[in-house]
């Protein structure tokens, strides 16, 4: 007797970039919430966060990532967080994992290279991102904690930051733009917000 129809599980591949704990925790929490009867989940995370992913009911794979301390140093100086060479290496690592798991959909948290990697494999891509980076709203990001902010009055620093923010956004987008050009993908308009938010839709 036929008791039901066996449906294929949706294969979801999560990329948890190792920049900060938050970038690992968010994909991890989402992966845990997916019903294992409906979803075939794989979570890729840097080996440094292995203690967070023991004893889970889905597959865990190591992910090549820039060291968190390097990310923190660049963030403190207001420098672009990833250079072209790093992102190019990320694409190679991404493609190897995508080819290994053959997902139906990819979910990434601050894995900027997925703007390219997912496109090269024609796989739907969902980007996890803070809402204030949405290009659908006016550019008004919160003042980051930079190395020099402790030495100047916050109102003055905020005033300066608001005026240079559009230029800083373009500067931070340059490595991703160069990466997309290398692989023949269209420009995101030198807008860093689109590198983290709407790259999932392009």
For every predicted segment, state its role:
Residues 16-28:
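A short, glycine/small-residue-rich beta-strand->loop->alpha-helix junction that serves as a flexible
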Residues 40-45, 105-108, 187, 201-202:
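Short, hydrophobic beta-strand segments that form beta-sheet elements in well-ordered domains
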Residues 74-113, 163-192:
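Conserved nucleotide-sugar donor-binding subdomain of glycosyltransferases
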Residues 126-202:
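Active-site-proximal region of nucleotide-activated glycan assembly enzymes
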Residues 9, 18, 36-37, 41-85:
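Conserved nucleotide-sugar phosphate-binding/catalytic loop shared by glycosyltransferases and other
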Residues 11-13:
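Residues that mark the start of a beta-strand
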Residues 33, 52, 116-117:
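Hydrophobic/aromatic ligand-binding patch that stacks against planar heteroaromatic rings
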Residues 89-153:
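Conserved nucleotide-sugar donor-interacting segment of glycosyltransferase catalytic cores
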